[in-house]
Regions:
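Sec/Tat signal peptide C-region and signal peptidase I cleavage site
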Residues: 7-13
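Extracytosolic ligand-binding ectodomains
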Residues: 13-376
Length: 376
């Protein structure tokens, strides 16, 4: 009697779903874009390793160069591609502002992972635009109250003249005045400015306690190094836009020491999911750090994939699921979108550079009273 024939059951290949990542992969803030891309890539890799996943995911990365015109071009490219269901989009606020109408026109849901200008979500009624990170309003409220609470009284503000920089100037100035600080002068500089001798010479004469900088890492490095050359001893505090390894590398460990930055959300590296993220990120041996906003890109990609798993790769259905996001656990904490699809961020974390690394203020020697900031 012959053996019965065994028929192999074919394994059906999973449908491939494309997700776009858009950020600055080249240029002065490419470190942030590459960290964001790697983090979104990690989310996709981990999801594809999950046998319970209904779909196979592919990340389509595009470089917006942190330039609005380029951002519109690449946003149009991915949004016009119907095989791309949604996007993890933008670190630079000016780019996020320019591309919102594009995603709205094509009906492609986008989850912003780094841009902090409030109007990205609050300045429109685009149901396609969501944001997992907080806004500069939160940052500047804390930045002003914290520094006046330490005893500082006199400020000079330097900001870049993009929407990002002007927004930080607006909100920080308002909160500082409410907190009792005085502004001796405000200086707008271009985003690609190299020489700050004119501005810093005037600032040296004003003798501020603190220089507040509203801009991104490349300018912060130049300003900090040129402050030193001109003998300016003021304390430097900046926005989340300078919290990067590139700032410390560019300014050097000695000059970067004591610089302050404020970023929305709990310290992700202290959350259980953050430890998981750090371990998995290290295993992939990416050539770049995840940087401050990498975890937000990771969370954004996972929110999109969760929605696809629930309703399938349909843009409108995915958008509607994202719009109803409430108390979803992520590595950045619980995510809840308000009626403008803005994540409600409960707190701002204060960071200071100590011994060549960004350290949570409360855990630093400065926060513990063992070291003092400039002028205290």
């Amino acid at each position: 009697m012959g053996l019965p024939m065994l028929l192999a059951t074919p394994v059906m290949a999973k449908e491939v779903v494309k997700i776009a990542f858009v950020g600055p992969l080249t240029g002065g803030v490419s470190n942030m874009g590459l960290g964001g891309r790697n983090s979104a890539d990690l989310a996709v890799r981990l999801r594809n390793e999950n046998p319970k996943s209904k779909y196979s995911y592919e990340l389509v990365a595009q470089d917006d160069e942190c330039k609005p015109n380029v951002g519109v071009q690449v946003a149009t490219k991915v949004a016009a591609d119907k095989s791309v269901v949604a996007g993890v989009t933008h670190y630079c606020s000016a780019v996020a502002m320019a591309t919102g109408p594009v995603y709205n026109r094509f009906g492609m849901p986008a989850v912003v992972w780094g841009a902090v200008l409030p109007d990205v979500t609050y300045g429109n009624e685009f149901k396609e635009i969501h944001r997992v990170n907080g806004t500069m309003i939160n940052q500047n409220d804390v930045a002003a109250k914290f520094m006046t609470g330490l005893g500082y009284k006199k400020w000079v503000i330097i900001h870049d003249t993009t929407d990002y920089g002007k927004g930080h100037n607006k909100y920080f100035s308002e909160f500082l005045q409410k907190s009792g600080g005085s502004i001796l002068g405000t200086f707008g500089v271009t985003a690609d400015q190299q020489d700050f001798t004119t501005e810093l010479t005037k600032i040296r004469e004003l003798k501020p306690d603190v220089i507040f900088f509203g801009g991104l890492t490349p300018l912060a490095v130049r300003i900090r190094t040129q402050m030193d050359k001109l003998g300016i001893k003021a304390q430097l505090e900046g926005t989340s836009g300078i919290k990067s390894d590139a700032y410390i590398q560019g300014a050097g460990k000695e000059l970067a020491e004591g610089t302050l930055s404020f970023i929305e959300g709990a310290p992700w590296e202290k959350l259980p999911g953050g430890l998981f993220f750090t371990g998995k990120y290290s295993q992939q041996k990416y050539g770049e750090s995840a940087e401050a906003y990498g975890p937000f890109a990771f969370a954004a990609a996972n929110l999109i994939m969760d929605a696809v798993e629930k309703v399938g790769p349909d843009r409108k259905k995915v958008r509607d699921v994202l719009n109803k996001t409430k108390d979803v656990d992520t590595i950045i904490g619980k995510v809840t979108f308000d009626d403008h699809r803005q994540n409600i961020v409960p707190l701002i974390t204060k960071y200071v550079v100590e011994n060549g690394a960004w350290v949570v203020w409360e855990e630093s020697s400065y926060g513990k009273g063992k070291r003092k900031l400039t002028g205290l």
